[in-house]
Amino acid sequence: MPSSVPWCLLLLAGLCCLVPSSLAEDLQGCAVQETHATAHDEEHLQEPAEHKIAPNLADFAFSLYRHVAHQSNTTNIFFSPVSIATAFALLSLGAKGDTHTQILEGLSFNLTELAEAQIHDGFQHLLNALNHSDNQLQLTTGNGLFIDESAKLLDKFLEDVKKLYHSEAFSINFRDTEEAKKQINDYVEKGTQGKIVDLVKDLDKDTVLALVNYIFFKGTWEKPFEPEYTTEQDFHVDEKTTVRVPMMHRLSSFDVQYSDTLSSWVLLLDYAGNATAFFILPDQGKLQHLEDTLTKGILARFLGNRHSSFVNVHLPKLSISGTYDLTSILPELGITKVFSRQADLSGITEEVPLTVSKALHKAVLTIDEKGTEAAGTTMWEIMPISLPPDLKFNRPFVLIIYDRNTKSPLFVGKVVDPTQK
């Protein structure tokens, strides 16, 4: 066996990562050490654990988005910051030294402001809250640890990942790469109810551990679009390229506002449940300005200042995906050692030096007309006398799905070309 054995970290993620678990009993035993805490301190201590990490997740989401966007302005972007952060927070349980510090700081955590135990508490409560938020969103997720039958992982690492991230562990023979691929792909296909097949295309026979994270998500709009009003329309990819796309249409009362700061129109559409979609349409020539300016504070202001107006909304139906090699993206955020031969993952196993040789993230998004059915009620909408304005998402726009309950960005994307798969 070579002196440095690669650890293949495989990630498949959609809109969010949901792992049923709770640290409520553990946190009930925590005592407040300061007897003269300020009102702000007391409020922070009473704050839900998942809310404590939400600002960091938002910072990570926008930082990662900008790095991905700067790599190419001609392709769609779609990824789940919550899923990526969860996977690497899990990985940090087995990291030590600079490797450990780089991972958490790369995820936008400041260890002088938030203790590591609070970070893991936050993730556990976040995943638990997402998984139990409601029954109106179809969510399927899982974390699978596939361990080579020749490897001996440390008991503490296995206990921590099972307790905190509810990971399943499987023994596998990576030397038989075809059978190993089949076992992993069967696990993902079963977990996603057949929606995701052949996730793993190739494996290194020297792999000793593969972490597979998958997600399947399907949400419905609170106010659906009517399919009979969907028509083929132009979408302007750039000044020289126009494609024909099925464009949904609805004349209704929408949460929409114009942002001078972003030079963009912002449309908020609620899913049935706790999720809200932000569709952000920049003025002509202002896409990069939007990408450079958007922050978690601006999003919070939109949510806190919602108001409705009658608008003709035109939104493309689409099905897009994003696949990313995180070994080339995360180093730009300062996470470098875990992908090198200097990686210290001795908290996973002390038998051989490990490095992450592969870290894949895949996310899939489908937007269509479907929404929840009204149950035995009829709603009349009073139309304005003046002609309502048109809001046409017929050029590149930014998309964010946000969970209102946990205050977390479930996914971030950019639609450059709705016909691009």
From Swiss-Prot:
Instruction: Recite the UniProt keywords alphabetically.
Output: Acute phase, Glycoprotein, Protease inhibitor, Secreted, Serine protease inhibitor, Signal
Where does the protein end up?
Answer: Secreted
Modification note: N-glycosylated with carbohydrates having biantennary side chains.
Query: One of this protein's Pfam families, by short name?
Result: Serpin
GO BP: any one term? acute-phase response
Question: Which comment does the entry carry about domains?
Answer: The reactive center loop (RCL) extends out from the body of the protein and directs binding to the target protease. The protease cleaves the serpin at the reactive site within the RCL, establishing a covalent linkage between the serpin reactive site and the active site of the protease. The resulting inactive serpin-protease complex is highly stable.
The entry's protein name is: Alpha-1-antiproteinase 2
* Organism encoding this protein: Equus caballus (Horse)
